[in-house]
Amino acid sequence: MREILHIQGGQCGNQIGAKFWEVICDEHGVDNTGKYNGDSDLQLERINVYYNEASGGRYVPRAVLMDLEPGTMDSVRSGPFGQIFRPDNFVFGQSGAGNNWAKGHYTEGAELIDSVLDVVRKEAENCDCLQGFQVCHSLGGGTGSGMGTLLISKIREEYPDRMMLTFSVFPSPKVSDTVVEPYNATLSVHQLVENADECMVLDNEALYDICFRTLKLATPTFGDLNHLISATMSGVTCCLRFPGQLNSDLRKLAVNLIPFPRLHFFMVGFAPLTSRGSQQYRALTVPELTQQMWDAKNMMCAADPRHGRYLTACAMFRGKMSTKEVDEQMINVQNKNSSYFVEWIPNNVKSSVCDIPPKGLKMASTFIGNSTSIQEMFRRVSEQFTAMFRRKAFLHWYTGEGMDEMEFTEAESDMNDLVAEYQQYQDATADDEYEEGEEEEEEAA
């Protein structure tokens, strides 16, 4: 019932995805051979959201793994949970996308896409009532961004009424892996605006800061960063996998978070923040969780919610707690910080409560916010894009794969439109509407 099909693409996506499955297996008591050895019936009650039950009582993730080069897949396969995946669900090429969006989207990726779609179809047919897809990828490289968005648009064509949720790692402001990141990211956002329902925006730099400042890790590795992401990913779907008092699913989430269809880029946070291996020893209270969850330092993308306003937000609590207390805390947050919420959407914070906490914690919470301040990220990428595109730097790598300059111009203006839309709603007040009507009448006169 209500299955979610997980897809991971490119190096970043596969590494995040591998971590995610470690967390999910742990929560459901599935070991790295797919055998169940948990201690509670609740772990099995809705295990089929993320797993197929195979012969011999093994649980196999509903996961499709794709990449344009074999390297990362090999390391996933030889990793701790590598043997749990279905071998047919690894789909990879040999050539690599070389950080080139056009290779991922038009040439190399397009050659591989049909084999990926075959696997997706096969997995979807195994589902009772498929709820939607979750895609892990980065927007800075070639495969996750180019081929990832190609796959998303193909799935959109074939399953138009299913939810499409992405976990997208944006290029960081200061830490850059490749020079052409702004190109790849802008071309990807252009696709995500059209074809995804909900995008959880992540950012390595913000994750580094959390590891460094809050978790006091001197030299955070990608493993530590992905550990944070996977905690959030697990939190977003816990309501589907465990019984709860206030449930939410991907569609309820979308209905409550997206006031305008294009504005579906969310910042995410998690509390309590703990480093790998060391769980905090003091039990947290709901007010403490709430405070940490809304803290700007806790956001996993490099945008500061204090620079904008929340259109909507959603708080998912896990553990044994009173729903009344949760509701009081949420109302409390809105009352104390009312200037940070748009006043023309009353009660714009939704909360849900799931009874089962993550492994090793008494209670935890996941935060998803639709804040206008996310425009900072788009704006930053857009500036870098324009700086290079003005000089047509590196463009030949893309046109050589059959792309047209027009596409770049379109993607650029789409990104700028998105920024303008966020700005427009940030500035809007509750009584704007009728004034606009009057102005139009005056102009007509």
UniProtKB/Swiss-Prot annotation:
Q: Does the keyword GTP-binding apply?
A: yes
UniProt binding sites for GTP:
Q11, E69, S138, G142, T143, G144, N204, N226
Residues the entry annotates as binding Mg(2+): E69
- Which cell locations does it reside in? Cytoplasm, Cytoskeleton
Function as written in the Swiss-Prot or TrEMBL entry:
Tubulin is the major constituent of microtubules, a cylinder consisting of laterally associated linear protofilaments composed of alpha- and beta-tubulin heterodimers. Microtubules grow by the addition of GTP-tubulin dimers to the microtubule end, where a stabilizing cap forms. Below the cap, tubulin dimers are in GDP-bound state, owing to GTPase activity of alpha-tubulin.
A GO MF label: metal ion binding
Q: Which UniProt keywords apply?
A: Cytoplasm, Cytoskeleton, GTP-binding, Magnesium, Metal-binding, Microtubule, Nucleotide-binding
Listed under GO biological process in this entry are: cell growth; microtubule cytoskeleton organization; mitotic cell cycle; response to ethylene; seed trichome elongation
Q: Which superkingdom, per the lineage?
A: Eukaryota
Q: Which cofactor does it need?
A: Mg(2+)
PROSITE patterns to which the protein is assigned, alphabetical: TUBULIN, TUBULIN_B_AUTOREG
Q: Which Pfam families match?
A: Tubulin (PF00091), Tubulin_C (PF03953)
This protein is called: Tubulin beta-5 chain
Q: Where is the composition biased (Acidic residues)?
A: 429-445
